Amino acid sequence: MPSLSITRQGWIAYAIAAVTVVLDQISKLWILGLLGREPGASLPLLGPIHLTMVHNYGMSFGLLRDSDWGRWLLIGFSILVVIGLAVWVHKATRPLLAVGIGLIIGGAIGNNLIDRVIYGYVVDFIDVSRLYFPWVFNIADSGISVGVALLLLDSFLSEENKLSHQTE
């Protein structure tokens, strides 16, 4: 029978996922209190950075935004991704991989599970469109993006490490 104990990398990933979810949800409660739920409400923050209320009903680039079943499809997909990543992290041996997985798990739970179940859409509010980045995003989105970048970096570093050991 397989062991149900959580590995060191698992603890790292779950702690980072929990922090990501908490920061994401606190920031969304704060922004909803500050701007209300009305889409388009905006407040300049610092230079080119604004806080702008956006209801994101779809996924990247607005995919599935007009679909009645898209919300539930995204919730189901997110559950599968979180389960898959939770299994993967227990096989992980490198902390960087665990950190990346934790950020992605936290982002998936914050955006596609909590927001879509509670609001029916994802609450986006970080607006840097004046810096030529047209998408409004949130902390969970940032967690997913940074997490994916860390997975790529970990993959590159582990391959480089394998190559250096082969040439010795």
Curated annotation (Swiss-Prot):
UniProt cross-references to InterPro entries, sorted A to Z: Peptidase_A8
Residues annotated as transmembrane: 15-35, 69-89, 95-115, 133-153
GO molecular function terms listed in the Swiss-Prot or TrEMBL record: aspartic-type endopeptidase activity
Record's keyword terms, sorted: Aspartyl protease, Cell inner membrane, Cell membrane, Hydrolase, Membrane, Protease, Transmembrane, Transmembrane helix
Main location: membrane
One GO term of the biological process aspect: proteolysis
Top-level taxon in the UniProt lineage: Bacteria
Membrane topology: Multi-pass membrane protein
Pathway the protein acts in: Protein modification; lipoprotein biosynthesis (signal peptide cleavage)
Cysteines paired by S-S bonds: none
Compartment(s): Cell inner membrane
Catalysed reaction equations from the record: Release of signal peptides from bacterial membrane prolipoproteins. Hydrolyzes -Xaa-Yaa-Zaa-|-(S,diacylglyceryl)Cys-, in which Xaa is hydrophobic (preferably Leu), and Yaa (Ala or Ser) and Zaa (Gly or Ala) have small, neutral side chains
GO cellular component term, pick one: plasma membrane
Family: Belongs to the peptidase A8 family.
PANTHER family linked: LIPOPROTEIN SIGNAL PEPTIDASE (PTHR33695:SF1)
Name of the protein in its database record: Lipoprotein signal peptidase
Species this protein is from: Caulobacter vibrioides (strain ATCC 19089 / CIP 103742 / CB 15) (Caulobacter crescentus)
Species lineage: Bacteria, Pseudomonadati, Pseudomonadota, Alphaproteobacteria, Caulobacterales
